């Protein structure tokens, strides 16, 4: 199985590293093209494009300017340890063993607006470039047109090399839109997490994001290889609902806390 997750806007470049091992992103040539485009933007333009504060716009203008392709542990950090959003709160990669990192390196991929596809141990320099942003580039009006089939081809390389039969889509819609499902050489499985509120089950963004991280960790902890094994997921009160699941979706519910 291959797990797909989204990146996070919140980054951590201060905490102690859980491992000193690293690899380098495989699509850095593409990243450099995007950096070239992003450097043309002033801080006010970044503010408008990303709908962020003056302070964040200044920070990201500086990040684009400072970005350079020679990554080391001094100027970059492993992606799975650098991202710190709700998904990564559930994943808790800072507590991985070396064996966990090994399994994740084979079976987990992070989709990224700037880096395309990241393996857990791939070094990355800090950035903010969400996949849905309309950054004009040589290939079109946004990042979906920029990446085209590149991300799908990169995922297929892993799928074909490892004989993977299933892709577990734990990414957000914004990021998964960069993948061409019909061109993937594997079957798609999408876990959906519903929380009860006022007697009704629905997707609550914060909880759903954390649950995607919890599910990723569950797969890694237990070295799972088959989709049916996902049905045993029961962390933090979630349970599998067979009746609600269909068409490649596995529905997990949790009663109101």
Swiss-Prot record:
GO terms for biological process: response to hydroperoxide. It comes from the Bacteria. Coiled coil: none annotated. It holds the Pfam family H2O2_YaaD. GO terms for cellular component: cytosol. Belongs to the UPF0246 family. NCBIfam families: PRK02101.1-1, PRK02101.1-3. This is UPF0246 protein YaaA. It comes from Escherichia fergusonii (strain ATCC 35469 / DSM 13698 / CCUG 18766 / IAM 14443 / JCM 21226 / LMG 7866 / NBRC 102419 / NCTC 12128 / CDC 0568-73).
């Amino acid at each position: 199985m291959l797990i797909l997750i989204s990146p996070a806007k919140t980054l951590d470049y201060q905490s102690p590293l859980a491992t000193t091992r690293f690899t380098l992103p495989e699509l850095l040539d593409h990243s450099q093209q995007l950096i070239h485009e992003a450097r043309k933007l002033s801080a006010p333009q970044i503010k408008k494009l990303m709908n962020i504060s003056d302070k964040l716009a200044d920070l990201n203008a500086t990040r684009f300017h400072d970005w350079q392709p020679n990554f080391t542990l001094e100027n970059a950090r492993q992606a799975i340890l650098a991202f710190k959003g709700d998904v990564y709160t559930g994943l808790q990669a800072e507590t991985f063993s070396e064996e966990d990192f090994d399994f994740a390196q084979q079976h987990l991929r992070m989709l990224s607006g700037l880096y395309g596809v990241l393996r857990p141990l791939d070094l990355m320099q800090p950035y903010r470039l969400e996949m849905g942003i309309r950054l004009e580039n040589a290939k079109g009006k946004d990042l979906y047109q920029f990446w085209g089939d590149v991300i799908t081809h990169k995922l297929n390389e892993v799928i074909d090399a490892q004989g993977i039969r299933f892709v577990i889509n734990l990414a957000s819609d914004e990021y998964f839109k960069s993948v061409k499902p019909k061109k993937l050489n594997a079957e798609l499985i999408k876990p959906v997490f519903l929380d009860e509120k006022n007697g009704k089950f629905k997707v609550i963004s914060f909880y759903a994001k954390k649950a995607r991280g919890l599910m990723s960790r569950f797969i890694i902890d237990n070295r799972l290889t088959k989709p049916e094994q996902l049905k045993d997921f029961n962390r933090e009160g979630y349970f599998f609902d067979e009746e609600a699941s269909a068409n490649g979706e596995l529905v997990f519910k949790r009663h109101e806390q």
